[in-house]
Amino acid sequence: MTKTALITGASSGIGRGIAHKFGQEGWEITLVARREKNLKNVAKEVEELGGKVHVFATDLTEKESPGNAVKFAIEKMGKVGTLVNNAGMGRFEMVPDIKDESYQEQFQLNVWACMATVRSIAPHFKKNGGGQIVNIGSIVGYLGISKGSIYSSTKWALRGLNESWREELYSDNIKVCYVGPGFVLTEFNGRKEGGTPEEQEWAMVPGDVAHAVYCVATQGPNSDIKEISIQVLDRS
């Protein structure tokens, strides 16, 4: 197992939590996100936790950005062992109010950027005898929600890509896993990062998802985790 990882969408939320977990475990990681200031803050946190970190600020929806991010990670780390496709966004509107721009933005980042990043890194994984891809989806990749038809459909699409990539890349020892978390206390969900103590009684925090991702990244050579669905514990 190569303890190096490329993590997208790492400037806050689940991506930040994943970066923290890998840093705590002593990995060398490359963090990618659009907001450079936030990204550098996360990098500092990771270093304080014991990880080695590189930062690449870019908008992954731009044509050349996914390939450039992969190239940067390879140049800095020499060999990438794990890709965590976490970058994503959501807009929540009733169907009569959906704008074309909203549809395009969500599919461009949540689907196209993930595909383009995998497309760029797959030859590197193949050359090095294998690798691990973790695609961060959502519980809404299994169901539909009111006002979330576009966001939900991007996560269904990502699951479809995940299934196809598993078939395509299996013979090259490249493992692919979809992680679909339920409600997590992040700014994406309109919450203060990590939530309040009261909120933590009923919802997940980024570290919960990070733990699952790390389990996938460190699985044994003879196991292949296909999919993880993480739901909030029902205490009723």
Which positions does each model-derived feature cover?
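Substrate-binding pocket helix/loop in short-chain dehydrogenase/reductase
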Residues: M94-V95, K99-Q104
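Residue(s) in the substrate-gating loop at a strand-loop-helix junction
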Residues: S138
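Conserved glycine-rich cofactor-binding loop
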Residues: S11-G13
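C-terminal helical subdomain
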Residues: Y178-V179, T196-S236
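Conserved glycine-rich Rossmann-like NAD(P)H-binding loop of the short-chain dehydrogenase/reductase
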Residues: E25-N41
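The beta1-alpha1 cofactor-binding region of Rossmann-like NAD(H)/NADP(H)-dependent oxidoreductases
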Residues: K37, A57-N68, D100
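Active-site helix of classical SDR
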Residues: V118, T154
